[in-house]
Regions:
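Solvent-exposed loop segments that connect transmembrane elements
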Residues: 224, 232-235, 310, 366-374
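Sec-dependent signal peptide recognition
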Residues: 2-8
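Membrane-proximal, glycine/serine-rich, low-complexity loop/turn segments characteristic
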Residues: 20-256, 265-280, 424-430, 639-644, ...
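Short coil/linker segments at helix-helix boundaries
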Residues: 240, 306-316
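Exposed, low-structure sequence patches enriched in small/polar residues
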Residues: 4, 136, 248-303, 318-657
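Hydrophobic h-region of N-terminal signal peptides that target proteins for export
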Residues: 9-18
Length: 657
């Protein structure tokens, strides 16, 4: 009832505001022309035409990257956040839940507060936010749901953005993902609330972001006996025994973000016109970026599960493990911008970054006196940064190359050089080749240095990790084709072994990847295919599926003089067998296992998507092949099956004037 009331309240905003599309960027292959970072609503209902300009600042303010938006419904039925980011994942079957991409090159960047790395897709952080300039306000409402009482799965996403003045924009966003879980003790929730704003007038540009992410995951330790899933039984999912039968075991997190960026433009202004915008540029600018982040992760047990956890060190009655962290980051840069007249004259910049981290956690435990102490561990680093770039959209050859070297503090000696070069193959830049590369030496995340929990204790002095990565791709938008290859060499790789303890290997880990994406069309039928091939040279520490496939097949057609847009089809997710990681609830991390392989099981979803004016509606049956025999080897993580079949539906509604 509360959710229904919230939906009505937010929907009523359309009586006094207007809306537009922002966060989804996937476009059906026949409608690329509607995808623009500066576009107008196709249904005029106001004397003021609706235009929107959206962008992000790259390299902490060095240059703008225009973010193309769309108003299409393709992919709305695939609303599980992790599968919008990666076509194959190891996860706990629930939405939301911790996850690990099975595609190595798309794995999440390690977060400063490491426990957040495995839930990154459910966080909204400053680097995810878009900046806006709109002629009219807008509101978007998304509500997706499935299951019934006791097994419901819901997503509510509401946001509103508007210009207060032509040069000043502000917005809010609220998202809630919740699930009762199909198996016992799987209740989960992830939600965030965000405020953001941007200001650009004459020589001054400002952007502001403030939000908080929260989450709660009940832990069940996976199913106790995999035969309940693999063999034919009539046992309902909610009655299948699990390893942690108590309903008072959970992981909880909180992440708070603040960012303020200021830019001051220097020199004589010059007006520049592009196909999508007209703007003013200056020869140079000075930038300051201030970021603060607060984190907390808490693991709780009301009663100790001695038969599941091999060790209990501190308290034999209950568990409360807590880690907190604060990150402060200040960066300054001086930028010489690209010259608007001489297209191939690059921009350059240099600056200083200062980063400070403070961890508070249990630091010692005396097993004889059973006393414990808590303390602070502090890390800091001062970095020199520099870069060169030419990202002018009117030239055929573009690049962005940056370097960062820590000269003072705990991270002294760490460095990172990364960038890309891209060459257009056609005058309209509809096809191109691109190469990306990264060389990095990074100290091991503090999470691996020391941890003292009720079930897990370690103290390590690991070497810094050196990473060399490169990939290249060929993209042809006219043929709807992408082909790519990549290689990653990692020296002193850190992982969790079969006992869920962190280890560092002396072997060089190499991962080879190749992929292809091809969208075929036959009349109104579309067949969008994505496939990844992978090979790890150290299968004993990193197992990956050799082949992963996402097949998106559908029929789409406009009816009733374009009043109704219809799309119906089937999605197939598949990967070959491999040793998928298992999951340890007490540290909220995935770890190696070599007891059994998972995979070689296609998951099929059938769907119907409809667009009626500005409302997108979908109905789908997820995991429909489960109905054929109600069993099978449909595990994701080693002890965690994916959900049985479920009917889901939802609506996405944009309000304009």
């Amino acid at each position: 009832m509360k959710k229904f009331i919230c939906i009505i309240l937010f929907a009523s905003l359309h009586l006094f505001c207007r809306a537009q599309n922002v966060f989804d960027t996937e476009t059906p292959p026949d409608m690329e022309g509607s995808n623009s970072s500066l576009s107008s609503d196709s249904i005029p209902e106001s004397n003021v035409p609706h235009f929107r300009h959206t962008w992000q600042w790259e390299r902490n303010g060095v240059y703008k990257r225009e973010v193309a938006l769309d108003t299409l419904m393709d992919g709305i039925q695939n609303f599980n956040t992790i599968f919008k980011k990666n076509i194959s994942n190891t996860y706990l079957g629930n939405f939301p839940s911790p996850y690990l991409s099975n595609i190595f090159i798309t794995r999440e960047t390690v977060q400063d507060f490491y426990p957040l790395t495995q839930i990154r897709a459910f966080l909204f952080k400053p680097e995810d936010a878009l900046l806006f300039n709109t002629t009219t306000p807008f509101t978007r409402l998304k509500y997706f749901t499935g299951g019934g009482k006791g097994k419901a799965e819901n997503l509510l996403d509401v946001w509103h953005v508007q210009n207060i003045r032509p040069w000043w924009n502000a917005g809010i966003r609220y998202q809630l993902i919740s699930s009762d879980g199909r198996y016992m003790n799987q209740k989960a929730k992830a939600y965030h609330f965000s405020l953001f704003s941007s200001y650009e007038k004459e020589r001054i540009a400002l952007s502001f972001f403030l939000n908080q992410n929260n989450g709660h995951f009940a832990e069940n330790g996976g199913v106790k006996d995999i035969s309940f899933i693999i063999d034919s039984t009539n046992q309902k999912a909610e009655n299948i025994p699990v390893n942690l039968s108590s309903n008072d075991i959970s992981n909880n997190y909180r992440n708070t973000n603040f960012q303020l960026q200021g830019q001051y433009n220097i020199g004589n202004p010059k007006e520049v016109t592009t196909p999508t915008d007209t703007f003013t540029t200056y020869p140079a600018k000075a930038i300051i970026n201030i970021r603060a982040e607060g984190n907390e992760r808490r693991y709780k047990e009301g009663n100790i599960a001695f038969d599941f956890f091999p060790h209990t060190y501190i308290d034999s009655t209950s568990t409360t493990d807590l880690i907190t962290n604060q990150v402060y980051d200040i960066s300054t840069k001086f930028v010489m911008n690209e010259h608007p007249k001489y297209k191939y004259l690059p921009g350059i910049y240099a600056g200083l970054d200062f980063k400070h981290e403070n961890y508070r956690q249990r630091t010692t435990f005396d097993s004889i006196s059973h006393t414990e102490s808590f303390g602070h561990t502090r890390y800091s680093g001062t970095y020199i940064t520099a870069g060169i770039f030419n990202v002018d959209t009117n030239v055929s050859f573009t690049y962005d190359i940056a370097g960062k070297l820590c000269v003072l503090g705990h991270y002294a000696g760490n460095f990172k050089f990364d960038g890309y070069v891209q060459q257009a193959l056609r005058k309209d830049r509809s096809s191109y080749i691109r190469a990306n590369a990264t060389i990095e030496l990074q100290s091991v995340n503090p999470f691996f240095d020391r941890y003292v929990g009720n079930h897990d204790i370690w103290e390590n002095d690991f070497k810094a990790i050196k990473t060399i990565k490169a990939d290249g791709r060929y993209v042809n938008n006219r043929l709807r084709t992408e082909l790519g290859v990549g290689i990653a060499n990692i020296f002193s790789y850190v992982y969790f072994d079969t006992a869920a303890m962190p280890q560092q290997t002396s072997k060089t880990l190499m991962v080879l990847t190749a992929w292809g994406k091809q969208n075929f069309r036959l009349g109104n039928f579309y067949f969008d295919q994505t496939v990844y091939f992978q090979k790890s040279t150290q299968e004993d520490i990193l197992s990956l599926p050799a082949i992963s496939v996402y097949s998106h097949n559908y029929f789409q057609h406009a009816l009733f003089k374009n009043a109704l847009f219809l799309q119906t089809g089937i999605d197939v997710f598949y990967n070959t067998k491999f040793y998928a990681d298992n999951y340890m609830p007490s540290i909220m991390q995935f770890y190696n296992q070599r007891e059994r392989k998972t995979g070689n099981y296609p998951k099929l979803d059938v769907f119907l998507n409809l667009r009626i004016k500005r409302a997108d509606i979908f109905v789908k049956y997820e995991h429909i092949n489960y109905l054929l025999k109600n069993h099978g080897d449909f595990f994701s993580a080693a002890d965690y099956p994916i959900n049985p079949g479920m009917l889901k539906f939802g609506i996405k509604w944009d309000f304009f004037d």
